Every structure is written in C-alpha cells, then in structure tokens.
Amino acid sequence: MKKPALVILAAGMGSRYGGLKQMDPMDSMGHAIIDYSIYDAKRAGFGKVVFVIKKAIEKDFKETVGARVPEGMEVCYAYQEVDALPEGYNVPEGRVKPWGTAHAVLCAKPFINEPFAVINADDYYGVDGYKVMADFLTSHEEKDGKAPFAMVGYHLGNTVTENGYVSRGVCEVDDNHQLLSITERTHIEKREDHAEFTEDDGATWASLPFDTLVSMNFFGFQPMIMDELEKGFPAFLNQAIKENPLKGEYFIPSVASDLLHDGKASLEVLVSKDQWYGVTYPEDKQSVIDALAALRENGTYKLSLIHISEPTRPISIS
C-alpha cells in the first residue's frame, strides 16, 4: 500500500491572529508549528506533503517552510484562491474570504491518488495523532460499500483559549468509536468550568461541557472524497451566494456528515493521548512556545527538526 499523504491547509487569512502565523517561529531555531507537524508526519510514515496556500505567499512560504521539509518527502503545492470556482460561478462583489476547509482540500485534488490526512497549518496535534492516523490509513480498505475515513478527536477543554472565541466541530460518537455527526459551532468561548457557544452574535448562549469531543480538522480520507467535494461544491455555492455571499464557508465536517448520512463512508474517531496546542490569538503564542520547549527537554524532539547543510543561526522569539 502507498504511503499516505498529508494535506496541510495553509491558505487561511489568519483574520483573528493577524499575519502569516504558518511561518511564525516557535523556538530559537526558527521552527514554526507546521515544521513540527511535518516532522511528526514523516516519522509516522507519511510520504508526501501537499501545501494548500495562496499565490500571494508562495515565495515566502517556499523559501521558509518549503525549504525545511525533511529529505525523502515528496512536496507539492496547491493554490486556494477565492476565484477558484466551477465554470459559471463568479466571486460575489466584496468577497475576500477563502471558501473554507472543504474547498481548500478540493484544491489539492490534482496531487492526491492515495489515502491522505488533512491538518491545519497552525495547529499542533501531537506525535501520537500522526501515528494512529498513519496506521489507520495503511490498514483500512472499503467495507460494505463504505469508504473508511478517520478523525483524531480532542476534548473541548483542551482546545479552547483564554483569549477569545474559537470554532470547533462538535462530535457525536457511538460505542464503537464511529462518528455519527459533526456540528460546526463557529463561536465558542471558555468559561470557568465549561464552554458556551452562540449562533446569534451573543444574543443567546448554550453550554458545552469540557469533555465534549470536538474535531480539530485532523481527518483521514480515501481519494474518493475528492469527487464528492467536487460534486457538492456547486450546491454549497448556490446556497452561500444567496444567503451569506461574503462569509459563507464550505466545511470539511459538513461534507463528512453528509457522506455518513448517505451511507457512502464510515468515520472512526481515533484516540490520541497527546495535547492539542494552537495559536488562535497572539496572546496564545507563549503557551505554545513553553509547551514545545518542554517536549524538546523530555526528548520528544531534537533541537533541529530538519537536515540542513549549514548551521541554522538561533533566533530570538517573542
């Protein structure tokens, strides 16, 4: 069986954080979170990385993140632009926001002919997540006419921030770790001993326990999902252009839920023992720096994650 591929979603505008957080250094050697992700994926058995980026950051991205990909991994670049639409569709006037995670994955279709995982560029998922995902993708095949998908799940309390709201896919799982549904909650805030979400700009709030299982967009798919994404995109556009032309997004969890409902796929929730870390807001950065420093100290990572021909000059981080 082919080694699985890793599709990294790096085209987001970083509207809440500001700047290109995909390239923001998190240690004195200049590594960003994305470097740790690629390193973990390679040692777990992934053989290819597909970066989904915007043309506007291509040069900087290739000279930094792209240049640091470990030897032995195939590297591809796909481009998510707001005007990457099916024939007959035009960008709504005033639209600058990308069309969402499912559209980003669809942009990688020309480079995918093997099982693959999808991650966010600016999320740290932990070593174990890549191991369990690689094991799943290399050991599961279609059964009873259903394509085997997977997701690494995390407890909500381990994924919220003190510094603002987050967006999470809230999961319903059966006793066999099979996903029943994902509901996207785009505005979740942390409280003292739980979280709350709103769908009406704060007019009303509903409670979510910290042990609620959520998706952090770490999915594993078979190549067939690309055709499903392509078929579903026009229907999404028809609705979004009518109801929310400037901010409507095509989400991976929504597509996955539809395929589960239609009996075309099953989705197993994989258990990872590792903590998730991310930088949604600038104030989150120091906690990520501290966590990665602790992982280097305990031997999880060596100082340099990449093979380089010349020494890397340590840099200051702030």
Model feature map: region roles:
Residues I306-S318:
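Single conserved hydrophobic/aromatic residue that forms the stacking wall/gate
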Residues V173-D175, I182-L305:
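Conserved alpha/beta core of the MobA/IspD/sugar-nucleotide pyrophosphorylase nucleotidyltransferase superfamily
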